[in-house]
Structures are given as C-alpha cells and as structure tokens.
Amino acid sequence: MYQTTAALRSAFLEYFRTNGHQVVDSSSLVPVNDPTLLFTNAGMNQFKDVFLGEDKRSYTRATSSQRCVRAGGKHNDLDNVGYTARHHTFFEMLGNFSFGDYFKREAISFAWNFLTQELKLPKERLCVTIYETDDEAFDIWTKEIGVPAESLIRIGDNKGAPYASDNFWQMGDTGPCGPCSEIFYDHGDHIWGGRPGTPEEDGDRFIEIWNIVFMQYNRQASGEMLPLPKPSVDTGMGIERIAAIMQGVHSNYEIDIFQALIKKTAEILGVTDLENKSLRVISDHIRSCAFLIADGVMPSNEGRGYVLRRIIRRAVRHGNKLGATSSFFYKLVPTLIEVMGDAAKGLVETQAIVEKSLKAEEEQFARTLERGLGILDGALNELKGDVLDGETAFKLYDTYGFPVDLTADVCREREITVDEAGFEVAMAEQRSRAQAAGQFDTDYNDSLKIDEETHFSGYTELTAQGKVTAIYKAGESTDSLNAGEDAVIVLDSTPFYGESGGQCGDKGLLTAKGVEFDVKDTQKYGQAVGHQGTVNSGSISVGDTLEAIVDKKLRHRTELNHSVTHLLHAALRQLLGTHVTQKGSLVDAERLRFDFSHFEGVKPEELKAVEDLVNTQIRRNHKLSADVMDMDQAKERGAMALFGEKYTDEVRVVTMGDFSIELCGGTHVGRTGDIGLFKITSEGGIAAGVRRIEAVTGAAAMAYVAAQKAELDQAAALLKADSNSVVTKLKAQLDRTKLLEKELSQLKDKLAAATSADLAGEAKQVNGAKVLIKKLEGVDAGALRGLQDELKQKLGSGVVVLAIAGEAKVNLIVGVTKDLTAKVKAGELVASIAAQVGGKGGGRPDMAQAGGTEPEKLDGALEQVLPWLEERLA
C-alpha cells in the first residue's frame, strides 16, 4: 500500500479532502510579498496572512503538499546534503491547517488515524512529544487516543529562554505562537539513537515524522502570552521521511524518487557504485534547481539567483568528481518529471526552459572549473595545517566562480576547513574598492533626509501651483535662495515626477513674478519630491508659492519609452518564456534600457519577433488604464510585480489592453498607438543570466531608421548597387576578396621560397651550426613564419633570426632546428631580443615569435644575437 511517493502524496491529500479540507496547490518557491523569506520553506508560508487575520479565505480547513527549499539564509541545509540520510535542499511538506475551525482534539485525531489506520503503521513504533505544560494535549493523547503514558514525552524550555523549546512554536518574537506535539517513528534497535529528550536523541533511530502546532497565544513585545480568540492549527510532515518508512528503508535517499535519479545519474556518467555520496548530492540538487527555475528564479550573482547558482555549481563539481566530461545535469529533468508525478505540473510546462538554463549554467562553469580545482588542489597540497586561508577561497570565488561553500565542500573531503571569516574580510575589501572606484564627485543632495511630504499631481496635470516647504543648499537646510545658487526645492504639491521605478525625473521650471528656477532633475526623498536645479533670476524663500511647469516634450518622450517597456516585458515573456523577469530598467526622454533574466543570448530571429510583437501591440492602439487597488486584488487580476520593488498595501496597476498588466507608479501614454514605432538598437549580456535590450521609440525610432537607411544607401553607392541588392553584391565582393587573399598567400609562399634560397647563402658557421640573423625589407609580417620554416629546411642544422622594422613596431621570429633545441631555446632567444626593443614574446623551443615598439633599437639588439649564440653553441 502506498509504495510510491506519488501514491502517498495522493492518499494524504484525499484523506484530508474527505475530512472537509480544501486541497490547495503548492505555492511558488518564491514567497509572494514576504520580504522576510528567501524561499518558501514550510507549508504554512502561503497561509501566513490567514493565520495573522490579514487575509480571508473561503475555507477554514486546508491541506497541501508544499514544495520547499532550504539553502541560503537562516535555513540552510546545503553543507550537509549528501552526507546525511535526511538533509535536502528541496523537500515536500505535507500539511493540514485549521484557521479558527478545529483545534487540538481534531488535529491529533486526524494525524493519528492517518498514520495508524490509513498507513497502518504499528502503534508501538510511534512515540509523541508534547510541550511540558500542555496538559490538554497530554489528556487527549492518553485518554482519547489511547497512547500509553510511557510513549508520551514532555519537553520543556530546552533552548535557554522561556518558551524556547523544540515543542513550542512561534512565528517571530511577537505574534501567533503555541505548543506543539511531534510524532516520532522508531526505526528499530539495530540503529543507534535514543528517544527524544535523552542524550542520544540526535541518533537516527527515532525520527520525527509529523509536527502538529497549536497556535493558541498572541505573544506581546513584553513577553506576555494572550489567548487568541480563534486558535488555529498548522501541521507538517516531510513526505520523504514518511515515504522511507512506507518503503521499508531508513535513508531518504533509498526511496523511489531518489533511487530513480541516482540510477539515471549513474547511467549518464557511467558510474557503478550507487552508494557514492556524489550521486546523492546530484539527485538532491536537481530537484531544487529544476523547481526554482520553473518558479522563475534564474542563475545570477545576487539574491535567490546566486543561491541557485551555488547549488548548480555544487552539483556540477560532484559530477566532475565522478568523471563527467560534458554537460550532464540538465539530462536528469525528464526523469525528475516522471518520478514527481502530479507535483511536477509546473515543471512540465517549463521543461524546455529549465533544461536550457541548467545546460547554459553548467557549460559556463565548466570553462573555469578544471583550472579552479587545479589551483585549489595545489593550495591544499601545500597547506600546513587544516585551515584554508580566506584569501585563497576569495580568489577562487572572484576569479573562477567558486562559491565559498563549494570550496568548503572540496576541503571537507580532505578534513580541511575554510577560514570563512577571512573570506568575508576579503569580500568586504573588494566591495570597499569598488565603492571607492565609483565615487567621483560628492553630491550632498543624494543623501538628504527630508521629513516633508509632497502630493504628486503629475498623472493628470503638467502645470500646478505649489508652496515651498523646504530648501536645501549643499546638503544643508536654508530659508532662502538668490540668483545663481544651486539647490533642492521641496513643494507641498507638484506635477514633477521624481525618479523611481527606472523612470528619470522630470525637468522644467519653477516660476513666480520675477523668479525663475531651472529644474534640471527631480528626485524622491522619502515622501518628499525634491526639485534639483539653479535659480536663474530673483530670489526664493520657504513659504513662497511657485508655478511648477513640467517640460511637456521631455515628459511625453519619456512616457513613450516607459510604456513600451511594459509591452517589451510582456513580449519577452510570451516569446522567450515566463522565466523572463525584469532585472532593471532606465527610461528617459532619449531611449530605454531594459535588463531581464535569460540564460542565453537572444537570437536575431527571436529579437525580430519581439520587436514585431511590440509594434503589433502599438498598432492595436490599446487604451491604457491605471487603477489603484489593494495588493490582493492586483494579484487576482494577474498583475506582474517586479522582484526587489517594495509595495504598499495599495498599489497602482497599469493595464494595456489584454496584453500587459503590471504594478507601476510611473507616467504613461494614453494609448499604445501614441508610441508610434519601437526599434531595438542593441542586445547583449551584462552579467551571467542577465541580458540587456536598448531601444528607441517615436521620433527617435524614426531617426534611427532614417540613419540606418542612409548608411545602407551609402554602402550601396560604394558597391555600385541599388539598396535592394547590397547583400548580394557584398557577398560577391567578399568571395572575390577571399580568392584574392588565397592567391596573395600563394605568391607570398613563392616569394618566401625564392627569398630563402638567397638568404640561406648568407648564413654563418658557428661551432658547426649555421646561423642566419637578418633584418628584412619589403617582406610582409605574415610571411615570416613560412620563411623561417623554409630556411630551417635549407640550413639543415641551424638557427634563424628574422626581423622586420616598421613605424613604431618590430616583428621578430626565431627558428631552431630540433637537433639544437637542447642548447638553444627559440623562446628564450626571442624574449632576449624583444626585451631590447620594448616588447615581449615566446613560444616553443623550435619556433618563437615576439613584437616590440622601439624599432630604432633593433640593429643594436640583433648585434647581440651572435655572441649570445656563440656562448650557447660552444
């Protein structure tokens, strides 16, 4: 019964569905609007606001099988994965939840009946822990469920503070909390370990399988515990642990899901030892990596993307350890989909993107992996002691892309630890250097702390009156300004848009009778809007009323570029995949720049399709609407939220027909048709996994097209062709050029052969070897190599030194016949000559080349060659 993990998952959800629970799909591994979490790490995460009373659902009972990741941040199991029986970066948490519905009696009964009646686990193999003072739970377990008192264990405050216990759960320092009951399974006395609460509890005999949390208190900042008006229940059972029990194995890595992945990895890599720990690491890591990418996380150098990159690179390193010579990790995705069953729905839809992303990241890391491992191996071999210094760990991170935990993983296998504190010092020093390099001129206005609040009226008007509430000059508050002075002016109300969300601040004028202030930029300072600029005429004081006039032309052009970024974002997601997310943008009156997550360069045909789709949406002339609503409403409407942006409870939703809907506080056109034309001017990578598109719109796009056409016409004129046949004519010219280059090369070879016959006669005898040292005139540098080969053949046994002097340039080549390389090394000789003419070079013992920048010193350098050779050929 329930021999597969998929069958067990279905049985759990069906059991609770028949007991009145709403089956809720697993939420994304990326927590929505919860800045406290890096990844979803528990079943209750998606119900957090329900427990806090901030969200209402249509149900009061729920059940789910939640995908979870623990890697990075506070909850980090990465270092232990592969080395223990139960640590994972990815796991599924089965759970049932009550939101003010049932409480202890029903929760305990549901859990016990599922384990003993549905799964038919022997009751004598189960024991239960409760919080020391939870007499209510004790009575339910013993008197109603019938668990013997000796199988019930009270756990007190074992973590050094009141209510700090393995059996007392709390969401944070304040808020909902309460005691919990944990059910343990006894794997048998053949495995070392003791019952919970004993000195041997960390052994593997007694394994926690289900935690039932009773949220019955609201903890105050004072520490006081106030009873909740509606107590709730949150439970969690790791599917891997219960699957191990049902499948009669002890380690999670022995269950069906992991065994399928382990065997597939072994098959791909040609490994026969299925107990190898590296196979465990890889089989675990493919689960977290694949599902993270499916949920929109892409490998990068920051935040969630960097955690993903660390996990992928750890898996790739273990594959390398097993002998992998090419990309293998992405090949596990089909097997993962097969064994995950219903839990793989989101993965099926994104399979192609997941595989491409994994392969691209693996190939990128493979370029530096071998060299980095060689440097690490050398450092460990020379190590005196058992601690690798932080500087070396940082070099591996900075130069070869080795996350510090990957370095620690390699060291661990040799019983060596990494000085992680030293690593952090080196990292901090690099940050300081980067910050220092980026600081040129100090702008005191950038760090202003302004308490005032400004009302923004610029969505509906570009001219309005505002009262001066504050003035800042050189970072200091002042009461007045005179002509010629630079300052930041804060108004109580303004139509000027302060830079935010990638949109640059407005420019324009602040005026009054006899007064003009030139606004060169507008910035936000908390709730205030600051107008940065210069007083052109008159004087301004706090309390004055000014007319605020936004530059309409600049604002309009900026709006074109901002609106089209929404269309571009939607087009990229539609054509490249939903993994595409905005990573940054810059929108001003001249152009737009849009950064987005993608694992490879955008192909020309894809870029054209994106541009065409955006222009199609422009021609459809969608009406734009901007509506303010609460965050939940926005989510229900499918609005795109941008990662890294902070949103308030009320958000502004910008909609463009049925094509784009995003949260945005910026200013936009009235209809997409106002944009006119969209032209992409460039696409490229700015970081691993992050691409950048630059583009223009409207009149700027027309000017760009006109410039391209003018360039095409100029090329046509040079080729003596019409603009429609430029490519054909150019291809013919290139083919002709290749043919001429081939003929030229053949002529040079003939010339070299003829020249070599003449030059060979100029060779001198030096201790039985022929030596030719010659500065050549009228010979192309490209012919030197062939010429020295010809001369070596003609000399039979000898040394050839040839040089060409040009304007501020020297070309050198040295050839040595193989019978003389024990005495004369070509690389050593050419380096000696090059050093005298302001250059350097090197090569093989029988042939080496070099360059220099001081041709005036060449004759003197060549005069030194003969004595150098006489000494070595003696």
UniProtKB/Swiss-Prot annotation:
It catalyses: tRNA(Ala) + L-alanine + ATP = L-alanyl-tRNA(Ala) + AMP + diphosphate. One of its GO terms (biological process) is alanyl-tRNA aminoacylation. InterPro entries: aa-tRNA-synth_II/BPL/LPL (IPR045864), Ala-tRNA-lgiase_IIc (IPR002318), Ala-tRNA-ligase_IIc_anticod-bd (IPR018162), Ala-tRNA-synth_IIc_core (IPR018165), Ala-tRNA-synth_IIc_N (IPR018164), Ala-tRNA_ligase (IPR050058), Ala_tRNA_ligase_euk/bac (IPR023033), DHHA1_dom (IPR003156). Its main location: cytoplasm. Binds 1 zinc ion per subunit. Its EC number is 6.1.1.7. It comes from the Bacteria. It is an enzyme of class 6 (ligase). It holds the Pfam family DHHA1. Zn(2+) binds at residues 562, 566, 664, 668. It is found in: Cytoplasm. Its cofactor is Zn(2+). Keywords: Aminoacyl-tRNA synthetase, ATP-binding, Cytoplasm, Ligase, Metal-binding, Nucleotide-binding, Protein biosynthesis, RNA-binding, tRNA-binding, Zinc. HAMAP family: Ala_tRNA_synth_B. Consists of three domains; the N-terminal catalytic domain, the editing domain and the C-terminal C-Ala domain. The editing domain removes incorrectly charged amino acids, while the C-Ala domain, along with tRNA(Ala), serves as a bridge to cooperatively bring together the editing and aminoacylation centers thus stimulating deacylation of misacylated tRNAs. PANTHER family: ALANINE--TRNA LIGASE, CYTOPLASMIC, ALANYL-TRNA SYNTHETASE. Belongs to the class-II aminoacyl-tRNA synthetase family. This is Alanine--tRNA ligase. It comes from Shewanella woodyi (strain ATCC 51908 / MS32).
